[in-house]
Amino acid sequence: MSKFSFTIHSHYKKARSGVITTAHGEIRTPAFMPVGTRGAVKAMLTEAVVETGADILLGNTYHLMLQPSAERIAYLGGLHKFMNWDKPILTDSGGFQVMSLSKLCKITEEGVSFRSHINGNKYMLTPEYSTEIQYLLGSTITMALDECTPYPSTFEKAKTSMHLTTRWANRSRDAFVKREGYAQFGIIQGSVYKELREQSVKDLVKCDFEGYAIGGLAVGEGQELMFRVLDYVPDFLPQNKPRYLMGVGKPSDIIGAVSRGIDMFDCVIPTRSGRNGQAFTKYGTVNIRNSKYADDKEPLEHDCKCPACTNYTKAYLHHLVRIREILGPMLMTWHNLTYFQNLMSRIRTYIKLGKDFDFVH
């Protein structure tokens, strides 16, 4: 079994390209992770996700602990076997979903108490329990439990939240079962305050996580302010560890973040947009529901190798989406995930060649 490692092969200014080696294979970076919230990427076969070029996908601890339960998934052989995915899986800690989905959520020093949005059952998610759930799932990369600081937040509220995240990170690290090829990432918080972000990094680096995520962004602050934070946070982080920007996936955001030193991304944008009839292309976005595509004999993209582009016209995709045929969202999602993997591949190539890669429309 391979040890967990991160090797940087190329630099271009602050951007890096390399390979993360794990127990479940290699991840080419910069990497985009499709979101498989409940053990499936919506509207996609697992085999189809592989064909898009994805090296890793994301699972959701909160949803999987509720249905079908971490214990059941462990009994059935772990999340990899359960969903027939043999590449790396990163699972989030569940904290963000608890705080955003549960109407009766209470945050204390111990953890987060909440009621299931499914049946109202009461749960307590602690750093230790979140880490245990991810162990049962067999996650390649486990995330430490954090409190996602809302935006806007005052300096004092952000400071209190950041320190709670630090204490939870220490408990998560103590609970993590170290195994060859597996990793745990800590999550940097501090809202938009440089002093707090720097302190968060200093505190979490002491835990010696295998990688570090930047949380609390893409929560309403806007791209300009997000980039302002990313102008300095990566500089505080260890150069030899992967950097993961959580929940960010607009192509222009990815480009800007990679140029500031980020290595990993996840977002529901390509899948959600696909289900709603929006396609990403190198020429810009296409709303396939628009009536102007009803007689369009061209594919979404001529040089895209996904089934939607190699086999069908925009007119056919328009027809499927307008009549709400389930094949429509499937093909649109397949195309979007292929677009995002192609985007990451182009970025990696441009970094290797030492060229600017601001080519997103």
From Swiss-Prot:
Keyword Cell inner membrane: no
The keyword Secreted is assigned to this record: no
Classification via Pfam families: TGT
Keyword terms of this UniProt record: Glycosyltransferase, Metal-binding, Queuosine biosynthesis, Transferase, tRNA processing, Zinc
UniProt: Zn(2+) binding residues: 304, 306, 309, 335
SUPFAM superfamilies registered for this protein in UniProt: tRNA-guanine transglycosylase
EC number: 2.4.2.29
Binding-site positions, substrate: 92-96, 146, 189, 216
UniProt pathway: tRNA modification; tRNA-queuosine biosynthesis
A GO term from the CC aspect: cytoplasm
Cofactor(s) annotated in UniProt: Zn(2+)
Superkingdom in the source lineage: Bacteria
Catalytic activity line of the entry: 7-aminomethyl-7-carbaguanine + guanosine(34) in tRNA = 7-aminomethyl-7-carbaguanosine(34) in tRNA + guanine
One GO-annotated biological process of the protein: queuosine biosynthetic process
Gene Ontology MF: a single term: tRNA-guanosine(34) queuine transglycosylase activity
Segments of this protein annotated with the region RNA binding: 247-253, 271-275
Free-text cofactor note: Binds 1 zinc ion per subunit.
Stated family: Belongs to the queuine tRNA-ribosyltransferase family.
Subunit comment: Homodimer. Within each dimer, one monomer is responsible for RNA recognition and catalysis, while the other monomer binds to the replacement base PreQ1.
Role of this protein: Catalyzes the base-exchange of a guanine (G) residue with the queuine precursor 7-aminomethyl-7-deazaguanine (PreQ1) at position 34 (anticodon wobble position) in tRNAs with GU(N) anticodons (tRNA-Asp, -Asn, -His and -Tyr). Catalysis occurs through a double-displacement mechanism. The nucleophile active site attacks the C1' of nucleotide 34 to detach the guanine base from the RNA, forming a covalent enzyme-RNA intermediate. The proton acceptor active site deprotonates the incoming PreQ1, allowing a nucleophilic attack on the C1' of the ribose to form the product.
Protein name in the entry: Queuine tRNA-ribosyltransferase
Source organism per UniProt: Rickettsia prowazekii (strain Madrid E)
